[in-house]
Amino acid sequence: MRVVFKLPDELRQELKNPLGELIEGNIPEPYVKAKNIIEGDDGVLITVGDVVTENIMRVGLNPNLAIYDHKTERREYKPRIIINGVLLTVKNPPGTITLPLLKSIKKAYSLILNGKSVHIVVNGEEDLATIPAVLYAPLGATVIYGQPKRGIVLIKVTNECKRRCAKIMRRMEVVRDGD
């Protein structure tokens, strides 16, 4: 049976608010600021989004986990991303979090614990992947995702932000085959 977590309309507006620290500015400014914040940090670095992953790599940081979909703002995008690790691909329709996406993110963290870097290329849309990326991340990890027209959002993973993401997941509509 296929299970999908679907974003209900009432959560859509809420998720337009940053889940962490908003770093505003034009490229490359937010990425340079993010680098200064996290440089020297031994924690796991996760990027969500093509533009975010590309620009984090451009300022000299290599994410342990990069999740992207070859799109930006719903348009095709060919990021200049060097895949320097394990490549996983997964299907995930827009506005959803599928079980295969959840399993890929969990698998990625186990690979990271074994010293690997992981890229998850999503066929569909990765916009909601930040939620499970935070949920499954080790405490102290940094998750960075894009905030359209504003900049990037930097999340330091704590128990509190894990609880917030779990609460969001619980509020999503669970759809099973045949529903």
From Swiss-Prot:
Keyword GTP-binding recorded: yes
Record carries keyword Nucleotide-binding: yes
UniProt xrefs under Pfam families: DUF359
UniProt EC number: 2.7.1.237
One of the record's GO molecular function terms: kinase activity
Listed pathway(s): Cofactor biosynthesis; coenzyme A biosynthesis
Residue numbers binding GTP: D50, V51, V52, D69, K71, E126
Enzyme class: transferase
Domain of life: Archaea
Catalytic activity as recorded in UniProt: 3'-dephospho-CoA + GTP = GDP + CoA + H(+)
Record's keyword terms, sorted: Coenzyme A biosynthesis, GTP-binding, Kinase, Nucleotide-binding, Transferase
InterPro entries xref list: deph_CoA_kin_Thcocales, GTP-dep_dephospho-CoA_kin
GO terms (BP aspect): coenzyme A biosynthetic process
Function: Catalyzes the GTP-dependent phosphorylation of the 3'-hydroxyl group of dephosphocoenzyme A to form coenzyme A (CoA).
PANTHER family: GTP-DEPENDENT DEPHOSPHO-COA KINASE (PTHR40732:SF1), UPF0218 PROTEIN TK1697 (PTHR40732)
Family under the similarity heading: Belongs to the GTP-dependent DPCK family.
Name of this protein: GTP-dependent dephospho-CoA kinase
Source species of the chain: Pyrococcus horikoshii (strain ATCC 700860 / DSM 12428 / JCM 9974 / NBRC 100139 / OT-3)
